[in-house]
Amino acid sequence: MQGYCLDFWRSGNWLGLVPAALLVLITAASAGRAVIVEDWTANRVGQRGIPSGWTGEGFGRRADYDFTIEQAGEVRMLHLQSQNEHSTIVKDITGKVVLKETPILEWSWKASVLPKGGDVRRKETTDIAAQLYIVWPRFPALLRSRIIGYVWDATTPVSTVVRSQKTGTVTFIVLRSGSKDLGKWLTERRNVVEDYRDLFGEFPENPTAITISIDSNDTQSAAESFIGPIIFREK
C-alpha cells in the first residue's frame, strides 16, 4: 500500500483531484447570488508573501508570511506554511457583503501539518494550522470587537465553541480536528447569521473584514495549510 501511494503521488494524478474539489465551490456559487471575496486570481502563480489586496497583522510577534500562490487546474489557492511563528493577513470587505442577501460563507481548505499539541482551549497552546475569521470591529476595538474564527485545530473536538484565552474578542468554532482528514481538500459551508445569533443573541451588522492566519509559535512546532476561494452566497 505504501508503494502504491508513493507511485500515485509521483505520477501527478493527484493533481486532478484538487481542482475537482475546489471547482464544486465555484460552480455552486455561480448558481445563485454570490460575492467572491477572494479567489486569488489577482495574484500571479508563484507569488510569495502577503497577497495582493491583503495587509499583514504582526501583533508585535515574528511573522514570516511564508505564503505562496499556487494553482491546480483552473483554481488558485493560497499555500500557508509556519515554523515557530505567527502570520495573519487581513482583507477589507467593507460594503461588499450584505448578510441579509448572502449569509452563507463557503470556502475550501486543506491542512497538511498540524502544530504539535495545538489546543485552542489553552492560552499557551493556541496554535492552529487553518484559520478563517469574520470581523465586526466595534469601539474600542481591543475590547468590544466581535470576531468569529472557523478553525482546524490539532486536538480540540469538532463543534467546540470556545472564547480565545488570548483575546476576549475572538470566539473559535472548531470545524475540523486532528489528523482524520489531513491532506484532504474539504469544502465548508456556514450560515454566518446563525452563528452570530447563537453567539451574541442578535442579528449581525455586515462584516468589514476577513482574516486568515497560521501559527506555530506557542508550541514551537510547524504548521501547513491551503485555502481556496472564499465566497458569501445566498441560502
Task: Please provide the spans of the model-predicted regions.
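Extracellular ligand-binding interfaces
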Residues: S112-D181, A223-F226, I231-R233
